[in-house]
């Protein structure tokens, strides 16, 4: 009789130890990521490029047609050259169809359509995928693939 009870206890202990140590509140995590993305758009549209780039971890990789570029500096340079004139955005940015989903307790994926409109220029649009990771400082984008 003791053997089945002991076996059950060992199986339960193994199941508990195999479970994630900390359960996360995904709804709060998703809301935080969405908030950061929305604040990034607002910053871009008011001409605050550092504010727009604040979502990125300092070691982010940005995928380009020529391959990945590491760090925030190349992203900032590309945005200044292509999307800003005299410290102001050439067009207004918006995101559509934003979806955020968990990849685990400390990782998430965000996808959306980006649209640049106005400024007496033709509208441009494409899609992006942002890989997010929970850092000691909070959620940060660690990889950006935009097309």
What is the meaning of each model-derived region?
Residues 1-4:
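Positively charged n-region of N-terminal signal peptides that target proteins for export
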Residues 59-70, 84-89:
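A short gly/proline-enriched turn/hairpin at secondary-structure junctions
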Residues 56, 66, 99, 112-114, ...:
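A mature extracytoplasmic/lumenal domain signature
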Residues 7-18:
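Bacterial N-terminal signal peptides
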Residues 18-58, 74:
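Short, low-complexity N-terminal intrinsically disordered segments enriched in polar/charged residues
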Residues 77-122:
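Surface-exposed, charged secondary-structure patches
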Residues 125-147:
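Short beta-strand edge/turn micro-motifs at domain boundaries
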